[in-house]
Amino acid sequence: VGSGDGVKITYVFVEAALELVPRELLGSRDVISSARRKGVDPSRMLLDISYHYRSMRRYLADWYKRGRPDIIHTSLLLLSSSPLWSRGLIDAVVETRHGLVFVRSGVRIPRNYNRFVSLMEQVLVEGSAPPGSENPLIYLVKKDLLEYIDEQPLEYIVLLNEKGKKEDPFSLCKKIAMSRRSAILIGGFQRGEFSKRILSRGFERISIYGESLDTWAVVCKINSILESILGIF
């Protein structure tokens, strides 16, 4: 396809397991304990199933889809390590329960997980990183994902889902690369299915494998093919 001039691809992590501790868990013993260890207010701390499993399992009906910040950390690390990222051809949007987190092309994602957690806590609490910046590198917008998608001049939108129509990842990536503006919707959670709100929207649903894959495995596969098609390697 060529050098990718004029191409912009947005990775959208849908229903991401990235959020602050919800109100119903703030008084839970494991939440209070982990907040004390970190020296932070529980309401300003990310929900993490590694530390908050007991209270999540007890109080959250959809606990199995929540509390996995590492999924987004690993996926963003993979994206930000790509020349497509540094050249401004790809960027990322993370759908959270607090709104949409926008990650600009070229932003360096902290390699250290604890630093990433602190960064996301800052963004979700303060609204941006750095806080108060006129041109933040990462920022939160209180907007519905579907409303955001409707506002974008997208030529192609694909929802990657193991229950979708089977398609070779190379042919899928060719369609993405041939579009000047496209969005790749990927589940940002560890288990379960997309909500009816997403599935009923009518997005083209494609499966590149036929079985469930980790979010970062999908990112790695799609991005490596795009790098080849767009002439990076």
Regions found by a protein language model. Give the residues of each.
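RNase H-like, Mg2+-dependent phosphodiesterase core
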Residues: K174-A177, A217
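Adenosine-cofactor binding site in Rossmann-like domains, unifying the SAM/SAH pocket
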Residues: E167, S171, S207-G210
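RNA substrate-binding interface of SAM-dependent RNA methyltransferases
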Residues: G4-K163, E227-G231
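Short, well-ordered alpha-helix to beta-strand connector turns
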Residues: L154-E155, R180, R201-F203
